[in-house]
Amino acid sequence: MALCLILLPTSGAFADVGAADEALPAAVKATAADEKTKPALPVPVNAKAALLMDASGGQILAQTGAHEKLFPASVTKIMPLLLVMEAFDRGELQLTDTVKVSADAAKKGGSQIWLKEGETMTVDELLRAAAIYSANDACTALGEHLAGSEEAFVAALNRRAKELGMNDTNFVNGTGLDDTTDEHLTSAYDVAVMSRELLKHPLILNYTTVWMDSLRGGATQLVNTNKLVRTYPGITGLKTGTTNKAGCCVSASAKRDDLQLIAVVLGSPTSNDRFDGAKALLNWGFANYAALTPKLDPALVPPVAVLRGTEETIQPVLPQIAPVVLKKGEEGKLQQEIQLAVDVQAPVEEGQALGKVIYSIGGKALAEYPLTAPESVGKMTFGEMFRRLLGALGK
């Protein structure tokens, strides 16, 4: 299979988000080597670890202690919320489903809505309690309903973490309570990864952006533990957490125009420190970065010849291209490289890779998207080959 390469500057709609004051994308990860140097952040953040990530492509824009294993407290709940969203996508769960509260869920300490054993609530109500108020009993009830038991749910949390490449993470529970364990750990990088995945589900914003709500006919008041929801322009969530071991933690996400950022702060000594740190990171990100949505000209992606196929050519499907995050002023430096097969051998499967589009600056890849076959193409039989040959000779 031969390849043709096309390298050219991009054109696109540039979204200048202004100063703050809110596909196969290639993630730029912090490495173990980064940990040895403990990089300085561009803004003051009083925390054990902090990180700013572009939610579109997964680029790390700033970090310190990104892979240091720390207690996350209730920031843990991002993963249970993700599993609930994915269960909705699979049709395994509905917002109107009713959940009967178990004795174990009712006994959960810490932040709670005082669920009683045998009490019933809808999935929607439990989601509101878990996402807005960080209720441990509601989160546990959701997990038990989804997986059958808390143990099975924790196993599912850890499986999903491994699938996402969260190699610094070990969940002991779905709440973040750490008073009886020293093994419930994650990192700022892993928190950003699961936050980014959760933000792919727009439904979650119906919960994480709510400042105040109520349950039980107004008898139970819910106030969001993330005070940035009330004060920060463009905020989309996401989750706070506080324990004696973890300190004060937050994963804060915000979006302005096409630029969505995730600021993770772990191990701050006070609540104000975590919010000030997250806000400072977001402000710096919006002031210094912007989103460019490249335009891929269909004329640059010609049909690919299919050798011995029932069709002579196949037209690759153009990918849906997400915004690429760049330093402001670098939009003219973005290059688009198209790698496309000249021909492929039949049979061709639907979705088969025929090439890819790579966006880069100075040789550093920022995002990569596949060019795929829209449908299957079968292999010609001997009779079909003979008829095609006769047809060609007769012209």
Residue ranges with predicted function:
Residues M1-P9:
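Bacterial N-terminal signal peptides
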Residues C4, C139, C248-C249:
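Generic recognition of cysteine residues
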Residues A2, A13, V17-G18:
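Cleavable N-terminal signal peptides
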Residues M166, N170, D182-K395:
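Domain-terminus/edge residues, biased toward the C-terminal soluble/receptor-binding domains
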